[in-house]
């Protein structure tokens, strides 16, 4: 895709109010949602994603119950957003067509349909319904590090064929490096239409969230996911204010006020964190083992319950190639580790 961030405008997609849910166990209050959404809107981001961390209808026993419903959160954000595109995320099998239609009725105009990187076909119906509603639609290929670039590109091609306007390289495990990101976007270029946008969703588990987003833009990614103070699963997403500062230094075009983003990150977001969103031994283990970032809090809970090291659980999850949706297996892994030690 021919895209030059020095002459073409980046599309900055904030994920503080969706991926950021994972960082505080989906406990955002509606007042906080209003405050954050207003700050983001005034700072000039292009789109603001709002839902449970696991997407529409994600508030369940398996993923964790939210402090409010998706509808409460979406309504709170819609009350204050004046310019940004209200966006949500849907994982087929968790969210349904009915939730998608309800979100649209509440003002959501963009959706990311998220599947595991080998399962683009399960998003066909939801992408089609979103297009029929007139929504902007992105295909979101989660855990993109788990398959080779050419295989990922074939999945991206499916999402394009279903009607996605944009297809993401989604580094859910924060396990990709810059070469891996570039290789995947170059593979996209070999099969996707020039008019289909590319996107990058980075996690910071190896401290490469910003670097991966920078090289993604240089490789043709128009849409850049990021969050205030990196608020997100694991070590968080690419920190929005940091990415924008780096983009400014490169002379790239976007609509964001970096100072306003810095203020929102430090004054609004960091005080909400009950566990610091940072690279530490546990979150580093996510990227090292290539594990789904939202497993972090579940694994820490299991480790505390059974008296074992969180890192052991995370590494074993990586060895077993567990993916999003298998949160219920974390307890099984912990018990297997205890049994192995006893023997």
Curated annotation (Swiss-Prot):
Is Oxidoreductase there in the keyword field? Answer: no
Query: Where along this sequence does the record place binding of Mn(2+)?
Result: 19, 201, 203
UniProt xrefs under SUPFAM superfamilies: Aldolase (SSF51569), post-HMGL domain-like (SSF89000)
Q: Single GO molecular-function term?
A: 4-hydroxy-2-oxovalerate aldolase activity
Report the protein name in the record: 4-hydroxy-2-oxovalerate aldolase 2
GO BP terms, alphabetized: catabolic process; L-leucine biosynthetic process
Residues reported in the UniProt entry to bind substrate: 18-19, 172, 201, 292
In the UniProt entry, which residues are flagged as the active site?
A: 22
Q: Which residues form the Pyruvate carboxyltransferase domain?
A: 10-262
Arranged from A to Z, the UniProt key words for this protein are: Aromatic hydrocarbons catabolism, Lyase, Manganese, Metal-binding, Plasmid
Question: Which HAMAP family did the record assign?
Answer: HOA (MF_01656)
Recite the lineage of the species.
Answer: Bacteria, Pseudomonadati, Pseudomonadota, Alphaproteobacteria, Sphingomonadales
List, alphabetically, the CDD domains matched.
DRE_TIM_HOA
Q: What class of enzyme is it?
A: lyase
EC number of the protein: 4.1.3.39
Family that this chain belongs to: Belongs to the 4-hydroxy-2-oxovalerate aldolase family.
């Amino acid at each position: 895709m021919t895209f030059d961030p020095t002459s073409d405008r980046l599309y900055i997609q904030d994920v503080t109010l969706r991926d950021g849910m994972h960082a505080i166990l989906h406990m955002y209050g509606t007042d906080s949602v209003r405050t954050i959404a207003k700050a983001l809107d005034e700072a000039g981001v292009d789109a603001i994603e709002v839902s449970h961390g696991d997407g529409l209808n994600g508030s369940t026993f398996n993923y964790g119950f939210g402090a409010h419903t998706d509808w409460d959160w979406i309504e709170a954000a819609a009350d204050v957003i004046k310019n940004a595109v209200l966006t949500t995320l849907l994982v087929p099998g968790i969210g349904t067509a009915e939730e998608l239609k309800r979100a649209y009725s509440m003002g959501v105009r963009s959706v990311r349909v998220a599947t595991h990187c080998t399962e683009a076909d399960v998003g066909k119906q939801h992408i089609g319904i979103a297009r029929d509603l007139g929504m902007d639609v992105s295909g979101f290929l989660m855990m993109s590090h788990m398959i080779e670039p050419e295989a990922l590109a074939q999945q991206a091609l499916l999402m394009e064929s279903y009607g996605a306007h944009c297809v993401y390289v989604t580094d859910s495990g924060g396990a990709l490096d810059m070469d891996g990101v570039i290789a995947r976007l170059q593979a996209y270029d070999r099969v996707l239409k020039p008019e289909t946008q590319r996107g990058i969703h980075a996690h910071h588990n190896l401290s490469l969230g910003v670097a991966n987003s920078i090289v993604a833009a240089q490789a043709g990614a128009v849409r850049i996911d990021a969050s205030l103070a990196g608020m997100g699963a694991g070590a968080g997403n690419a920190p929005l204010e940091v990415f924008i500062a780096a983009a400014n230094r490169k002379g790239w075009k976007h609509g964001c006020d970096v100072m306003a983003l810095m203020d929102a990150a430090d004054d609004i977001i960091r005080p909400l964190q009950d566990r610091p969103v940072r690279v530490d031994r546990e979150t580093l283990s996510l990227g090292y083992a290539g594990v789904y970032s939202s497993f972090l809090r579940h694994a820490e809970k299991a480790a505390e319950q059974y008296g074992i090291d969180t890192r052991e659980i995370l590494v074993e999850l990586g060895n077993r190639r567990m993916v999003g949706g298998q949160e219920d297996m974390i307890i099984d892994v912990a018990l297997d580790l205890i049994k192995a030690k006893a023997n």
